[in-house]
Amino acid sequence: AKMPDNFIDLTVTSPPYDGLRTYNGYSFPFEEIAKELYRVTKQGGVLVWIVGDATVKGSETGTSFKQALYFMQCGFNLHDTMIYQKISYMPNKKAKRYDGLFEFMFVFSKNTPKTFNEITEERTNIEKSICKKDIMVRQKDGSFKKSERINKGTTKKMGNVWTYLNNSNSTKDKIAFEHPAIFPEQLANDHIISWSNENDLIYDPFMGSGTTAKMA
């Protein structure tokens, strides 16, 4: 049975990509899944697609970008391109490239997101000092105009680069940690807080380690 149209408020998921993980021979029909996700997402709903790229014969595949563009072809807005930065990672001393520390978190929306509950964080001492000063903003004609200090207070809205542990400390669930493609519980929690409200319907079409369901 299919889900009804315009049914899901928020999807938070990380698909298998570029053959980096095997799922008991399960095939991954991306285009079919993308179309279905658009169909079942409510107007104003959000899809968070957490994905990276493999390196094959010396070149990154670019799969993440291809998928993002296809979601836009399906009708989604690319609301934000966020970064999941990993604190713990496996260094590759042999590769002639810098170690990969991040994955993309593409935030797609069906029209404008109906919900945004911003998460704040403490400002650094340097930021607090800067906020006490007047800010000069360059105008289109090249002149400068004093701007109001809009960034007041000791906290600020988080940026779109989120940093998490990605080892055994990222979950208290032993069964979840044994899954080959776990993402941090706090990451799922932060997206659920940001893009949904109580009693909204949260979805993960892959449900690998159950992190999204657990945090919802």
Features from the language model and the residues they span:
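Core catalytic lobe of class I
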Residues: A1-A216
